[in-house]
A protein has these predicted regions:
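Membrane-embedded alpha-helical bundles that constitute the cytochrome b-like, heme-associated redox core
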Residues: 1-153
Length: 153
């Protein structure tokens, strides 16, 4: 439906904005986010999470693995030949992988806002946030590629 597409576009836009604000300073000058860049990053995060929850609820049933896809997945894990004609397995797996990665991305930053973890714990949570964010962006890029490729077959 149109609402799902709009939410997907908003979620991807928020992810792009957060990626640019997070990694541009790090790549350009090896500095962390501060000031307005940090406020933009933090301001788009709740919108992204709300969109992610909506996408999980609205696309979750469509992206469940069917009996044939479970068989294909098991064959691929056991390195057996598997028929992949019209298979949606990788598209569904990247969807669930992306949705799963959104949890540690969100919770690691949320947990680091509390002082119960101490200084070292906050640094560890920040590193978890950085690396899971990078994995999330990579997974979403692969998912969008597979989605567009499947749509324009």
């Amino acid at each position: 439906s149109k609402l799902k597409r709009i939410v997907l576009i908003v979620a991807v836009t928020c992810l792009i904005v957060m990626f640019i604000t997070a990694f541009s300073g790090r790549l350009a000058a090896n500095q962390l986010m501060t000031g307005y860049i940090l406020m933009i990053h933090v301001g788009t995060a709740p919108v992204f999470i709300v969109c992610t929850v909506f996408l999980i609820v609205s696309w979750g049933y469509q992206c469940r693995l069917t009996e044939n896809e479970w068989g294909e997945l098991l064959n691929r894990i056991m390195l057996k030949p598997a028929s992949h004609e019209n298979s949606m397995l990788f598209l569904k797996l990247t969807f669930w992988f992306s949705m799963g990665l959104s949890v540690p991305v969100s919770l690691s930053m949320l947990a680091s806002m509390f002082t119960i973890f101490g200084t070292h714990g906050q640094e560890v949570l920040f590193n978890i946030h950085q690396y899971t964010s990078l994995a999330l962006v990579s997974s979403v890029v692969i998912h969008l590629y597979l989605l567009l490729r499947n749509q324009y077959k």
